[in-house]
Structures are given as structure tokens and as C-alpha cells.
């Protein structure tokens, strides 16, 4: 195809992708200052770039106030198109730069603490040896946070527990893990028979705050036996719940992988819950449109394969059931 068949007119002034990226961050955070913090720059720089974009388009994109900013009608139209434009440009860059089959660039991956404890020390050195020009940044967070970051394009992939169904996500189940009741080694848990849901109803439970998968499972289980779920403490941080269990304040629920280090160190003991349904599924997720990127496909396949291999070799705490692969 000849260049004149698709080239823009010589006097056309195309949009700057940097300005579009800044616009997306301001739209997401609804704040010039928070967008500046996310992008590692100053608020005046963000303000100038949004001003340049508005001047280029000839419309106002935000309505500012003391509380932040909201999109105008024109801004709403742009936010509906800008992320996909930026992704397409990223795909073009990857396809061109990788035309010689060199795996390079950078990707961000998320992982829950339970999986990170087992896999991060294994994955990162192998990735570095296999693809020395590929930089992989790993962040650890709660499953709910990881889902949001994948959907927003901040993470290329994530390994987490039981993501909710979403049309923009591709979910790849990896392992089914049984939940455990976790407590201090000097607690009654040491001599307790495998604890049932009815047993849990009589214990001082410290649980994740509402909306997290373990909390949701327990709420459903307690409803089935007509018992109210009344934890003595709630926290969004699994690390905080673990530490409170170490101190003997109460009991919490985690996977074997999530407490393997503390159990090995003698800080905690764990008993698997035998009740049906007291399981979670470790799942790898990617955004549907991101799977067109070769690096995302390569890393996703590798991570999924390694996690399943570790479990099949009996090296994953609790001996979870391997799914797929």
C-alpha cells in the first residue's frame, strides 16, 4: 500500500500520546495532584499538559473545583477512546521492536502474599535468565486491589484468588487451595480436631474486612448454619491479621501458602477446614485486550506453567489441587 493511501495530511496536528496518558491519569484519579504523584512529576507540569491538550482539541476536558475535577462531556468522549488508542500504540511498538524475536521491554505483574511467598523467589531469577532484556516489576497486594489494577491497565497480569467475573478479563485457574484455621502454637488449635464451621462460630475470629473472598466464603457458610458472623477484629491487611494471630489475640483463616513461613518458623499452626466449599482458587488474570501483546502472553504462560509445576512436584504448602495445564 502506498503511503498516500493512509498518511495524514501534512498540515494535520496529531495528538501527543504523552498528553493523552496524562489525561487518562487525571480522569482516573479525578485529581491533578494525585495524577502528578502517580506519574512522579509535579502538579504544575500536569496542569500545563492538560492545558496543551485542551488547546489542541479546542475544548475543556475537566471542570475543576477545590475537591478535584470531573470530566466534561468532551472529556467523557475522550476517555472512552484514549486508553484503547494508547494500548494500540503500545502494541505497534512491541510488534516492531520485537520483529527480530528479541524479548525486551518492561511488564508489571501483581501477586497475592500467599502466592508470592512460594513463587516470587523462584520466578524472578528464572525470568531474568530466560529473558535478560525483559524487566518485570512485581507488586504484592490483596486480590481485590490486583483485579482493579489489571482492569485499569496498571498491571499486565496478576495471580490472585477467585476474581469476580468480568467481560474484560481472561481468567486462568491454576490451583485449588483449602482454607486453614490459623492460630498461635500455644492456642487450643493444637489439640483441636479438624475444625468445622460450627467450631468457628465459637472462636474469636479476626477476619478480612467485607468484600474479600475469605470473608465472603465465611459469611455464606455461617448463613447456612444460621449463625451470625461476628469477628472480634476486622482488617484489610492480611499481614496484620497474621501478626495478631502470632500474638495469640485470636484466630484467622488463610491458605497454607499464606502462612507457610510462619508455620515453619514455629510462630503459627494451621489446621485445614474440612467443610465443603472452604476452598479458594488461585487464578492468573489478564485484561482481554492485553493478550494481544506477545510479552504478556509469554509471561502469562510461563508463570502459569511454573506455578502448576511447583504444585505437582509437591513443593506448594498444603498440596493444592492443580487445575488445567
From Swiss-Prot:
Residues 32-51 bind DNA. The keyword Transport does not apply. The lineage of its organism: Bacteria, Pseudomonadati, Pseudomonadota, Betaproteobacteria, Burkholderiales. The keyword Transcription applies. InterPro entries: LysR_subst-bd (IPR005119), Tscrpt_reg_HTH_LysR (IPR000847), WH-like_DNA-bd_sf (IPR036388), WH_DNA-bd_sf (IPR036390). Residues 15-72 form the HTH lysR-type domain. Belongs to the LysR transcriptional regulatory family. This is HTH-type transcriptional regulator BbuR. Pfam families: HTH_1, LysR_substrate. PROSITE patterns: HTH_LYSR. GO terms for molecular function: DNA-binding transcription factor activity; transcription cis-regulatory region binding. Keywords: DNA-binding, Transcription, Transcription regulation.
Amino acid at each position: 500500500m502506498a503511503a498516500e493511501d493512509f498518511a495524514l495530511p501534512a498540515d494535520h496536528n496529531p495528538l501527543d500520546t504523552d498528553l493523552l496518558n496524562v489525561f487518562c491519569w487525571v480522569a482516573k484519579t479525578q485529581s491533578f495532584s494525585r495524577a502528578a504523584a502517580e506519574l512522579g512529576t509535579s502538579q504544575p507540569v500536569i496542569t500545563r499538559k492538560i492545558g496543551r491538550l485542551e488547546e489542541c482539541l479546542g475544548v475543556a476536558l475537566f471542570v475543576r473545583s477545590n475537591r478535584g475535577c470531573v470530566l466534561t462531556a468532551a472529556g467523557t468522549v475522550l476517555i472512552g477512546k484514549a486508553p484503547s488508542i494508547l494500548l494500540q500504540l503500545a502494541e505497534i511498538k512491541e510488534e516492531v521492536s520485537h520483529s527480530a524475536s528479541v524479548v525486551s521491554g518492561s511488564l508489571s505483574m501483581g501477586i497475592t502474599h500467599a502466592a508470592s511467598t512460594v513463587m516470587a523467589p523462584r520466578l524472578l531469577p528464572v525470568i531474568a535468565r530466560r529473558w535478560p532484556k525483559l524487566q518485570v516489576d512485581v507488586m504484592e497486594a490483596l486480590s481485590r486491589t490486583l483485579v482493579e489494577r489489571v482492569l485499569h491497565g496498571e498491571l499486565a497480569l496478576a495471580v490472585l484468588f477467585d476474581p469476580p467475573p468480568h467481560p474484560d478479563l481472561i481468567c486462568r485457574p491454576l490451583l485449588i487451595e483449602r482454607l486453614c484455621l490459623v492460630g498461635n502454637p500455644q492456642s487450643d488449635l493444637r489439640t483441636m480436631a479438624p475444625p468445622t464451621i460450627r467450631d468457628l462460630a465459637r472462636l474469636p475470629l479476626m477476619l478480612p474486612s467485607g468484600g474479600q473472598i475469605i470473608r465472603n466464603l465465611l459469611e455464606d457458610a455461617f448463613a447456612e448454619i444460621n449463625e451470625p458472623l461476628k469477628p472480634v477484629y476486622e482488617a484489610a491487611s492480611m499481614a496484620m491479621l497474621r501478626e495478631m494471630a502470632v500474638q495469640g489475640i485470636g484466630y484467622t483463616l488463610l491458605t497454607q501458602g499464606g502462612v507457610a513461613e510462619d508455620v515453619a518458623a514455629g510462630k503459627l499452626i494451621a489446621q485445614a477446614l474440612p467443610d465443603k466449599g472452604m476452598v479458594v482458587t488461585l487464578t492468573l488474570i489478564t485484561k482481554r485486550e492485553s493478550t494481544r501483546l506477545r510479552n504478556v502472553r509469554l509471561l502469562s504462560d510461563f508463570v502459569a506453567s511454573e506455578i502448576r509445576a511447583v504444585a505437582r512436584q509437591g513443593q506448594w504448602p498444603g498440596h493444592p489441587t492443580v487445575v488445567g495445564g
